Design a protein with these regions (language model features):
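Short S/T/G/P-rich N-terminal loop/turn motif that feeds into the first structured element of a domain
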Residues: 1-69, 77-81, 111-121
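A generic "cationic amphipathic patch" detector
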Residues: 24, 86, 94-96
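Conserved short hydrophobic interaction patches
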Residues: 37-40, 89-93
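Conserved, mostly hydrophobic/aromatic
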Residues: 73
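Short amphipathic alpha-helices within nucleic acid-binding modules
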Residues: 79-89
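A common structural junction motif
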Residues: 91-103
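Conserved catalytic core of two-metal-ion nucleotidyltransferases
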Residues: 104-112
Length: 121
């Protein structure tokens, strides 16, 4: 039997206008929920998180629709269902005590594929 290869996945996360409309002293719960999301993905069975990046330093190249993405998580997921489950966390993680979910303040997109071969140097 052939061993099932993990799916290399890039989770792209964008901060929505609802976050920017919050008074500064009310943004903390969104960051707390974001950390909860990251921790949950790290703990998912069969998921290996390879790295994260917040692109608030510099972006090089064109972005025809502005700056849609804010941060990224690159990981190997055991299957498509695990990727869907990770994205679904935005629907279930609560932000603060107002009954809002993380997806009110951020959106997520998953890009699934395979690693490129590493060139021999």
């Amino acid at each position: 039997m052939t061993e099932k290869k993990p799916i290399r996945t890039l989770l792209c996360i964008a901060v929505l206008q609802n976050f920017f409309d919050l008074p500064f002293d009310q943004t903390g719960p969104v960051w707390t929920a974001t950390k909860q999301f990251l921790a949950a993905v790290h703990k998912m069975p069969g998921v290996t998180v390879l790295g994260t990046i917040d692109d608030d330093e510099t972006m090089v190249g064109t972005s025809p629709t502005g700056f849609p993405w804010t941060c990224y998580l690159l990981g190997d997921f055991p299957d498509r269902e695990a990727v869907v489950a990770a994205c679904n966390l935005f629907r279930t993680i609560e932000v603060g005590d107002q009954g809002h979910r993380l997806w009110r303040y951020m959106r997520i997109e998953a890009r699934m594929g395979r690693p490129l071969p590493t060139p021999e140097l």
